[in-house]
Amino acid sequence: MSKVDSTSTKRAKIRKRKRWERFDGYRLKNIPSFQKLIPFTMKRRSASLNYFEITYDAGEILKYLDGKNRNLEENFDPNNPIKQYTYTQFFMTLIVRMFALRPRLNRFVSRKNIYQRHNIEIAYVLKKDFSDDGEESTTVDTFERDSNIDDVGYILHDSIKSVKETTDDKSGDFVDTLMKLPNFIITFVTWIFDVLIYIGYCPAVLRKIDTMQSSVMFANLGSIGLEGTPHHHLYDRGTCSIFISVGRIRKQKYLGENGVEERDVVDFKITMDERIADGFYFVKSFELLKEILDNPQQLDDRLKEVPIDE
């Protein structure tokens, strides 16, 4: 585990993007020859999927968030944009930390090459109201690798506030305008976008609205009360290599020392592009996930150092 620092405002050192590199990542060279070969034999992301289903003890999550929120009430600061520490904020911080410490998870395959992404980018969907016809907005937020739970919270606050308070949904307006055009023009426009992404030069307007250009797609299905979480596929289009869905924290019975007991658990469903790393790396990453869930207090601190994937 990398060292953490709870007081310094200095951010961890990161790799600087070079001028000639793709907008979203840089090509990796120091990887085994066999792994370089895999994208040539497994050409599509949809044909390279691994599915993981894991249930973790959530007891420490509940204690951690309860303590954070009690401290928030006792030390109320009207200037603090974080009014409550939520499950979504916690799980997104967890993802940022896991991707920072296990950087191969932040890889993607394009043009049969393996790339490391410049930033950690989490894509998710926000609903303005929970109804069948409630308006949705797709969002991609960018996080620094050393971020703690407050850093993530500030970015989430701004994104959620922007979506819920504005009636100007640029992504929705763009799609609405596009879909009014004839089919052959729609086909041509999407083809142009795909070509630009393929060669690594994507227009800024597309980067901000296209959830398929991200490190991971995240769905907190517990926020809509869903206990069982389905697996979600990945898309051949774009560069997203991982989809994580999390269900509602639930009670699970188990056989303890005093007979049948109950504990709080949470279900993770993870879909991954197996071309970005080997199975052993994925397993060790899930061990880190469990270690953080068992000791969530470490998310209070920024990482002092982050590994760089070359």
Where are these regions (language model features)?
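C-terminal catalytic/motor cores of large multi-domain enzyme assemblies
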Residues: S2-E310
